[in-house]
Each structure stands twice: as structure tokens, then as C-alpha cells.
């Protein structure tokens, strides 16, 4: 079993820091269809340069296209995916099942990972992701170490799990708290991180 240390790269400084600190891979976004819209992210040219920078140092690059999209938005997302493929991206993370089907048609050689936003929290869910052609499943952040270990033992594909960072109280991909409280949808990449706010008693009427 090989362990991979994966770190987020929300901008150039974060990318360099992750690589210099020993990350085996980084995940990053460019364009409008990733779950890290609050990060600086990368332009097309910056993304191409970032992939080259990482690959020269033996570091893999994963693109996040892991938000829900509408039919109207799908062509633009597909164009971003093609650009990433041309840049040599190592894999793409997705949430939307329609995006999965589209990318399998237009860039069939690029591995696709099931984002934590897909709410995969059982072995059967991971097995279904594998059946549909995904090569890695990012488990939801709410699972215990024991549950993660059990899934890893029987999973037919690679498993990724969060060990540091935002630890949501709701199942990943199913939380509407940010949208209700701050009118910012976590499923559209704009989560306000309400579960990180100081808690108090509030009367709800």
C-alpha cells in the first residue's frame, strides 16, 4: 500500500509551499467550477505553469471540478477540463454525475476521482464509483478511523481521506447550512464555513 500526501494549492504561494514541504500531490482549481471559489485559484496560463512546476519535481496535480453544474454551464466546464487535459493534469475530481459522464466521453484517458462532495461514506458507494469508472474515492469527512479502515481493506479503487482542515458536521455534499445562513452554497463552491463559527444558543422560530 502506498500513502500519498496531498495538499491544497489555492494560489501560487500555497503551491510552492506545498511542494517544498514534501507534498506528493496537490489539488487546485481554475475557472468557475471548483469547490474552492474563495481561494485565489489559477488562470489558464498559471495552471499550465503550475503543472509543469510540479511535474518537474515529481509532484502530481489534480484539478477540482467538484461542484454541481447546470446544463447551461456544462460546455464551459468541459472546455476547462480539455484545457487541463492538454496541460497534463494527473486526475480530475468531480461531484456531479453528469460531469462524470461528460468527462469520460471527451477526455477518456484522464483519471477521475470522486470528490468528498459525492457523499461516499460506505463500501457499497465506493464500489459503485469503481463500477462507473472512477479510480479514486475521497471519503466524506465524518467517518471514524474504524469505518475508513474497513472501507480501505475491501475497496477496489484508491481511497483518499481528509486528515486536517475543515471537518464538516453534516455529510459532505449534503449540507445546506451555508446557503440558509449566509446565502452561499457549499455545493456551488462558496461555503461560508458556518460550522467553524463560535457556537451559541439561538432561538429558531
Where are these regions (language model features)?
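Active-site pocket-lining/capping segments in soluble small-molecule metabolic enzymes
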Residues: 1-120, 138-139, 147-205
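Hydrophobic alpha-helical bundles that form the membrane domains of multi-pass transporters
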Residues: 92, 132-133
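Conserved nucleotide-cofactor-binding alpha/beta core module
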Residues: 122-124
Amino acid at each position: 500500500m502506498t500513502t500519498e500526501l496531498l495538499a491544497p494549492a489555492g494560489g501560487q504561494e500555497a503551491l510552492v509551499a506545498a511542494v517544498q514541504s514534501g507534498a506528493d500531490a496537490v489539488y487546485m482549481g481554475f475557472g468557475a467550477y471548483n469547490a474552492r471559489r474563495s481561494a485565489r485559484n489559477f488562470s489558464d496560463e498559471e495552471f499550465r505553469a503550475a503543472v509543469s512546476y510540479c511535474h518537474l519535481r515529481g509532484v502530481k496535480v489534480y484539478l477540482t471540478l467538484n461542484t454541481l453544474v447546470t446544463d447551461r454551464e456544462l460546455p464551459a466546464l468541459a472546455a476547462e477540463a480539455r484545457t487541463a487535459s492538454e496541460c497534463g493534469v494527473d486526475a480530475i475530481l468531480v461531484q456531479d454525475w453528469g460531469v462524470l459522464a461528460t468527462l469520460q466521453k471527451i477526455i477518456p484517458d484522464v483519471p477521475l476521482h470522486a470528490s468528498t462532495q459525492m457523499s461516499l461514506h460506505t463500501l457499497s458507494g465506493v464500489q459503485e464509483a469503481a463500477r462507473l469508472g472512477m479510480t479514486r474515492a475521497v471519503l466524506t469527512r465524518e467517518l471514524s478511523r474504524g469505518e475508513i479502515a474497513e472501507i480501505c481493506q475491501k475497496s477496489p479503487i484508491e481511497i483518499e481521506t481528509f486528515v486536517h482542515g475543515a471537518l464538516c458536521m453534516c455529510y459532505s455534499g449534503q449540507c445546506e447550512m451555508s446557503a440558509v445562513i449566509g446565502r452561499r452554497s457549499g455545493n456551488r463552491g462558496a461555503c461560508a464555513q458556518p460550522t467553524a463559527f463560535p457556537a451559541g444558543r439561538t432561538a429558531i422560530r
